[in-house]
Curated annotation (Swiss-Prot):
This is dTTP/UTP pyrophosphatase. It comes from Geobacter sulfurreducens (strain ATCC 51573 / DSM 12127 / PCA). It is found in: Cytoplasm. Keywords: Cytoplasm, Hydrolase, Nucleotide metabolism. Its cofactor is a divalent metal cation. The record marks 14, 72, 156 as: Important for substrate specificity. It catalyses: dTTP + H2O = dTMP + diphosphate + H(+); UTP + H2O = UMP + diphosphate + H(+). Nucleoside triphosphate pyrophosphatase that hydrolyzes dTTP and UTP. May have a dual role in cell division arrest and in preventing the incorporation of modified nucleotides into cellular nucleic acids. One of its GO terms (molecular function) is UTP diphosphatase activity. GO terms for cellular component: cytoplasm.
Length: 191
């Protein structure tokens, strides 16, 4: 499927697995940018800004033609939830998500170094959690799984049973809206 050199600007094993599952050939070069929202920044703008910054920063330090950056956040009752800072934060996040609807937003960006072109989009999926008991939350947090996940959960892992329903892209909740990303890569000539 390769037409040019695509670089995934992410260390996320979930993004790597998703992109590879679509038959896309790519290299990986993790980006390291600050992930702090600007005061007043809308959640989708925050996620797409981080995705753009990851793609462009990676392009500045490695070879390639197209650079794909992505960032996933969870938004619940107006709070942007990134990765928990510690176990207590993970417990707090899961308690807040318990029994309510929230949004998972993944911003993604594709930077074309040759044309100096940039495509940025955000994909939103609505997720509803079942009401969670404190012992369920404690047991899940004790696994360590929530610690590197936005909103402190992985739909594809131990938290799958917590999800009553989703409206939108499942792969977006995992960390990369695969349908949209692959279609955009095709549309711009990367695939």
């Amino acid at each position: 499927m390769e037409k040019g050199r695509i670089v995934l600007a992410s260390a996320s094993p979930r993004r790597l697995e998703l992109l590879a599952s679509a038959g896309v050939e790519f290299d990986v070069c993790a980006s390291d940018i600050p992930e702090e929202p600007i005061p007043g920044e809308a959640p989708a703008d925050f996620a797409t800004r981080l995705a753009r910054d990851k793609a462009v920063a990676t392009a500045a330090r490695t070879e390639g033609r197209w650079f794909v950056g992505a960032d996933t956040i969870v938004v619940c009752a107006g709070e942007i939830m990134g990765k928990p800072v510690d176990e207590a934060d993970a417990v707090r996040m899961l308690r807040k998500l318990s029994g309510v609807s929230h949004e998972v937003i993944t911003g993604y960006a594709v930077y074309d170094r040759e044309r100096d072109g940039l495509l940025c989009k955000a994909v939103v999926t609505k997720v509803v959690f079942k009401p969670l008991r404190d012992e369920e939350i404690s047991a899940y947090v004790a696994t360590g799984c929530p610690m590197d996940k936005a909103g402190a959960y992985a739909i594809q892992g131990g938290a799958a049973y917590m999800v009553e329903r989703i409206d939108g892209s499942y792969t977006n909740v995992v960390g990369l809206p695969l349908c949209e990303v692959v279609e955009d890569l095709r549309r711009i000539g990367a695939l």
